[in-house]
Amino acid sequence: MERSSLAVILAAGDSTRMKSSKSKVLHPVAGRPMIGHVVEAVAGAGVGAVALVVGRDADNVAAAASLKGLQVEAFLQKERKGTGHAVLAAREAIKRGFDDVIVAYGDVPLITSATLDRAREAIAAGADVAVIGFHTDRPTGYGRLLVENGELVAIREEKDATDEERKVTWCNSGLMAINGRNALDLLDRIGNSNVKGEYYLTDVVEIARSLGRRAIAIDAPEKELTGCNNRAELAFIERLWQERRRHELMVDGVSMIAPETVFLSFDTKIGQDVLIEPNVVFGPGVTIEPGAIVHAFSHLEGAHLAEGAVVGPFARLRPGANLHANAKVGNFCEVKKAEIGEGAKVNHLTYIGDAFVGAGSNIGAGAITCNYDGYNKSETRIGANSFIGSNSSLVAPVTIGERAYIASGSVITDDVPADALAFGRARQEVKPGRAVALRERAKAQKEAKKKSS
């Protein structure tokens, strides 16, 4: 029988050290609010319900924590009286009865489903409390996990630790799992007889043991448990996330020439044998099929590249850009809300927006689709195997038929039939010797200005 699980995610802090107009859990890591990463991790661990403890920016935090298919309920913590008090803000959710309760933090976005799974497994195996800890060579400031004969006997805060206990390098992350059937009994026994008068969640370890119940500690990588309190730590977490995701992609068959210069989003999907050159940035919503190439200094967001497509260098793909197989968008091009058909080429210095470019078509340098009249967007449709000459302007709405030719420098405002050749420019005139007269006149004007000044 599958075990039921509730995750209580604490996200009610004032975020003072972040020095921000919004809660720190709303700050993005890889293009997604921190809280969103935590919710995804608990969902991946099989959690069926989330109790989100909120304070500042409650509505925005709750919105950022929503995840399709997962029940997320927000509980307002009106007063800040410690972590134990924060968890009990979700009392109504806890008392519904779950096999296990996970306590996580909205500002620890690198936590993985695998680690949370292990905590749940420990509860399923008979422990009443499973605390997630980490080993570090810099334990100063952290609570220490005191273990005897494989059992966690206490979490000792540094200020209360003996000299011998301070030598312990296994530290408390704050995350834990609790037997859901006993959770309220344990939590309600937490007292506030301390200098700050607060209710500390860490007390559940000694409370459980005093009742003859088991508490254990499980280990996780220190980096995974990194918390965020200020902008410097946010940048560090971003770096750790990027390093981890790049490594995962490269192990899965993606080539990156200089991975440290590639920046991914939380939902970037890249297939095998894709080559990513240096200094590429992926915004949210990008999918790249096998065998595609993204050249250096390109920026992609909300785009899809089919097998064998080529982008860049110095290209920008905006939301709705869809490159079919073997299509190419080259240097200094921008594509937005446009289909680029199979084998079509948009090689350089071009803007294609709100458009359809048929298979095999060639878009010359400097050609643009004029899609906006100041009020409305309109579509440009270019048929298969058409040729759009350099420096042409296609004024939407307009349709270019299959195999049509547009002469260079044209301004096209009317539809062009298939197989037609269209010109939309003034006829060239040549006036022999006129350049000499123009130069003499300009020179005389310049001399006259000098004399008058």
Curated annotation (Swiss-Prot):
To which species is this protein native?
Answer: Agrobacterium fabrum (strain C58 / ATCC 33970) (Agrobacterium tumefaciens (strain C58))
GO MF annotations in UniProt: glucosamine-1-phosphate N-acetyltransferase activity; magnesium ion binding; UDP-N-acetylglucosamine diphosphorylase activity
Per UniProt, Mg(2+) binds at: 107, 229
Question: What name has this protein been given in UniProt?
Answer: Bifunctional protein GlmU
The cofactor note reads: Binds 1 Mg(2+) ion per subunit.
User: Gene3D superfamilies from the xrefs?
Assistant: Hexapeptide repeat proteins, Spore Coat Polysaccharide Biosynthesis Protein SpsA, Chain A
SUPFAM superfamilies hit by this protein: Nucleotide-diphospho-sugar transferases, Trimeric LpxA-like enzymes
Active site per UniProt: 348 (proton acceptor)
So where does UDP-N-acetyl-alpha-D-glucosamine get bound?
A: 10-13, 24, 77, 82-83, 105-107, 143, 157, 172, 229, 318, 336, 351, 362
> Taxonomically, what lineage is the organism?
Bacteria, Pseudomonadati, Pseudomonadota, Alphaproteobacteria, Hyphomicrobiales
Q: Which cofactor does it need?
A: Mg(2+)
What span is annotated as the signal peptide, if there is one?
none
